[in-house]
Regions:
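PLP-dependent enzyme catalytic core of the Aspartate aminotransferase-like
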Residues: 187, 196, 200-228
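Active-site C-terminal subdomain of aminotransferase-like
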Residues: 64-145, 159, 228
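A short secondary-structure junction signal
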Residues: 2-5, 26-31, 49-55, 71-74, ...
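Short beta-strand-to-loop capping motifs
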Residues: 78, 170-174, 206-208
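Active-site phosphate-binding strand-loop segment of PLP-dependent enzymes
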Residues: 1-47
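Conserved PLP-binding catalytic core of the aspartate aminotransferase-like
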Residues: 154-184
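Conserved active-site segment immediately N-terminal to the catalytic lysine
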Residues: 40, 54-65
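A short linear hydrophobic-aromatic micro-motif
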Residues: 153-157, 189-195
Length: 228
């Protein structure tokens, strides 16, 4: 329920790997460690949701299925100087150089997911880019977290400074009201907010495409449960 802080990355490691946003626990790295070692980051669940200094990382990879398009494609940003430095033999298919040299068409590409990702990025650009969507995502998350903190029936599960803007995880304090709450949000047309099976509770995913109006519907149902 929190992001570790104050740690040092040993200088003799080959690389440091982190995941910028944890979808299961609802934590998100707001700052990244300074290190001279090779930095690798999985940004699958918050890529293009906020501004990031890409130059700080040697490799960034992200599955498309959260903020870019349908599942089946992966975006990779890699610095030229780290290519070919595996120090061991790896399968041709797993070598980034293979895909770079073939313009990402070493094998038959999944055309539809790539096409939809293009449309999504065009939509984001026309919206005003990452800076604009970052503000919109912050507004959505702030609204929902404010209700979680205000409403005595609900409780956040993550340290406030580490709360994710993409995956808002929370608990219902009164288990006797669980059926009533589930009925409310189901009737309101909300789906998929049950928490991950390993942690339970609830999880509202606020990815780029989620409009603020939908977040407000969930908040209204939380208030309605309180009134009942």
């Amino acid at each position: 329920n929190y992001i570790p802080k104050g740690y040092e990355i040993p200088s003799d490691v080959d690389y440091f790997h982190c995941t910028s946003n944890n979808t299961i626990y609802g934590t998100q790295m707001k700052e990244f460690p300074n290190s001279t070692t090779l930095m690798v980051c999985d940004m699958s669940s918050d890529i293009f949701s906020r501004r990031i200094d890409v130059s700080r990382f040697d490799i960034i990879y992200a599955g498309a299925q959260k903020n870019m398009g349908p599942a089946g494609t992966t975006l990779v940003i890699v610095k030229d100087e780290v290519l070919g430095k595996t120090g061991r033999n790896i399968p041709t298919m797993l070598d980034y150089n293979t895909h770079i040299s073939k313009d990402s068409m070493f094998n038959t590409p999944p055309v539809f997911p790539i096409y939809v990702s293009m449309l999504t990025l065009q939509w984001l650009k026309n919206l005003g880019g990452v800076e604009v969507i970052e503000k919109m995502n912050q507004e959505k998350a702030d609204l929902l977290y404010a209700e979680i903190d205000r409403n005595p029936l609900f409780e956040g599960t993550v340290a406030k400074e580490d709360r994710s803007n993409m995956n808002v995880c929370f608990l219902l304090n009164d288990s006797s009201k669980e059926d009533a709450f589930n009925t409310l949000w189901n009737a309101a047309g909300i789906s998929g907010i049950k928490g991950h099976r390993s942690v339970g509770g609830y999880r509202a995913s606020l990815y780029n495409a989620m409009p603020i109006e939908s977040v407000q519907v969930l908040i209204d149902m939380m208030k309605k449960l309180e009134q009942n």
